[in-house]
Amino acid sequence: MATPSPTKTTWKLQEIVAHGSSVSSVVLGKSSGRLVATGGDDCRVNLWSVNKPNCIMSLTGHTTPVESVRFNNAEELIVAGSQSGSLRVWDLEAAKILRTLMGHKANVCSLDFHPYGDFVASGSLDTNIKLWDVRRKGCVFRYKGHTQAVRCLRFSPDGKWLASASDDHSVKLWDLTAGKMMAELSEHKGPVNIIEFHPNEYLLASGSADRTVRFWDLEKFQLIGCTEGETIPVRAILFSSDGGCIFCGGRDALRVYGWEPDQCFDTVPVGWGKVCDLAICNKQLIGVSSAQSTISSFVVDLTRVKMTGCAPQGPVPAEMPISQPAPAGTSLRRIYERPSTTCSKPKRVSPTSDDEEKESRAEIQNPEDYKEIFQPKNAISRTPPRNSEPFPAPPEDDTSILKEPVAPIPDVVTPATSNKNNTEQLQRPPVAASTPIVCQEPSPVPAPQSKPPVISAARNEPIGLKAADFLPAVKTSSPTEVVDDEAVSQIRKGHDTMCMVLTSRMRNLDTVRAVWSSGDIKTSIDSAVAINDLSVVVDLLNIINQKASLWKLDLCLTVLPQIEKMLQSKYESYVQTGCISLKLILQRFLPLITDILAAPPSVGVDISREERLSKCKLCYKQLRILSPLVKSKASQSGRYGSAFRELHLLMSGLE
């Protein structure tokens, strides 16, 4: 019997241009694992199938960029929040808007549907959480307690609790019936990006910018576990269907963790970049990621992933469900019990007014896919519901198919028909024959002619740092045939200059490190500023920002001029460090500065007060200089536009 060719554990389904501008939010439908919703800076919400390149439906109505999107459990409703603070709820079966909800004063950062009621929770940059009754078109309750933006909201499986994660490093649990906070979980050392309830037990997982996933016992409200090993902030986590493990999507890999005891069961390399959301369907994990205006979908075969302390035994037969033993120590933990309700399906909400319906249109761009996905839900023949087939796994890459060696790429490539055909053949993704990609012709995104204003820190290749940037421009002759000596010379070009740059940076860091070892942070910052190398200042601030107690008023006076340079830098990492540092200064010292400046003069001579007053005046002056810069960048789109809008909100007291 011939041995079947091995198939891949992970593979890429497709990559599509989702919006005409940057993609700001991507979410998967958790029920089917087949629907994707994207929100963009073009103020639209687009619906996609994870394995088809055509947009199913485009929802309009928002007048500002969409910041967050969320499906309900049945994938019949979708809610989207915008930068202006408004929410819009659409009925996907009827292809029309249901509600427009207004009330937040800033960006809507997080959303979640109640598991079986007509309620939506929203968290905002204004630090407030609001519970909305979609049927009655109003705010039911407002939860206050966070001091920074609310990044994630999740209802408990029984619908009695609401968990919120915030940039203030905390996770809060709210009792919906009592309308008050039950507990605050504050062990994280960085902003909390994502939270998920265990599907059965009283357990909560939270992922943070401190690169850890923490597990919380919701009976005792105590930390019971913490993972280590993530290299970037955690933004996507998902419990397995039976709750035996948790999946964590990193930049280059999918990690499978257990708790009690803490352990990493498996690490699966996946090249999905910035993963945004995860879902499980048919023993496959679906992941979606975004980069600028494009989104990509990936599949991980869970039958080949180790999800317990034992090694996987190969593909699982179709009739056997995937199951793992419960982690040790969890057998005594309570499980959720859904309270009895009169019906298993929420009552249909009447559509909103005609005026809002005209403003918020649902443009069905692919009628066939729309009818296939949404219309059969109203038919009797759909009982029991359809079971989608798993995506077929492509075979492992075989290098033997390369019959001819690849010729070296010349400096200038002239267009030719044969080259075009070869390119199309090489770029065809490994998709099943039942999912054609000829319905539309998304042209590849052309390389920008001008240098982008900000160079992303999340990239797969070096960008922006070229040795030629440090050398005078030299006119080159017309391209000729490259010989070996010229090729070697071209490869080594700029090497000496780059070595000098790196050697100088290492010398500067050694100088600052010698001062830092004495424990004088102010002197360390002064020496870094005196060196006149902004990269050294950025490295030093990245350490100081991790511990807010290190900040002092005289340190602010030195750092604020450097922050102005960082915010105007073309490098994303510099801008990010500048935003974090300025945010810490505004939160910790702006109230102190304004109080001291507003206080009446004291009687007599107080030297320490005079020094403090002088420092406050200088800091206030520098903050006033930064205010127009922050305001101008607050109108930008994308992730850093949101960060600058938050800074602008904090600086409103200066005006």
Swiss-Prot record:
One of its GO terms (cellular component) is katanin complex. Pfam families: Katanin_con80 (PF13925), WD40 (PF00400). One of its GO terms (molecular function) is microtubule binding. Residues 316-453 are annotated as: Disordered. GO terms for biological process: cell division; microtubule severing. InterPro entries: G-protein_beta_WD-40_rep, Katanin_C-terminal, KTNB1, WD40/YVTN_repeat-like_dom_sf, WD40_repeat_CS, WD40_repeat_dom_sf, WD40_rpt. Disulfide bonds: none annotated. The keyword Flavoprotein does not apply. Residues 415-426 have a biased composition (Polar residues). Residues 358-374 have a biased composition (Basic and acidic residues). WD repeats lie at residues 18-58, 61-100, 103-142, 145-184, 187-226, 229-269. CDD domains: WD40. It is found in: Cytoplasm; Cytoplasm, Cytoskeleton, Microtubule organizing center, Centrosome; Cytoplasm, Cytoskeleton, Spindle pole; Cytoplasm, Cytoskeleton. Keywords: Cell cycle, Cell division, Cytoplasm, Cytoskeleton, Microtubule, Mitosis, Repeat, WD repeat. HAMAP family: Katanin_p80_B1 (MF_03022). Interacts with katna1. This interaction enhances the microtubule binding and severing activity of katna1 and also targets this activity to the centrosome. Belongs to the WD repeat KATNB1 family. PANTHER family: KATANIN P80 SUBUNIT, KATANIN P80 WD40 REPEAT-CONTAINING SUBUNIT B1. Participates in a complex which severs microtubules in an ATP-dependent manner. May act to target the enzymatic subunit of this complex to sites of action such as the centrosome. Microtubule severing may promote rapid reorganization of cellular microtubule arrays and the release of microtubules from the centrosome following nucleation. This is Katanin p80 WD40 repeat-containing subunit B1. It comes from Xenopus tropicalis (Western clawed frog). The gene is katnb1.
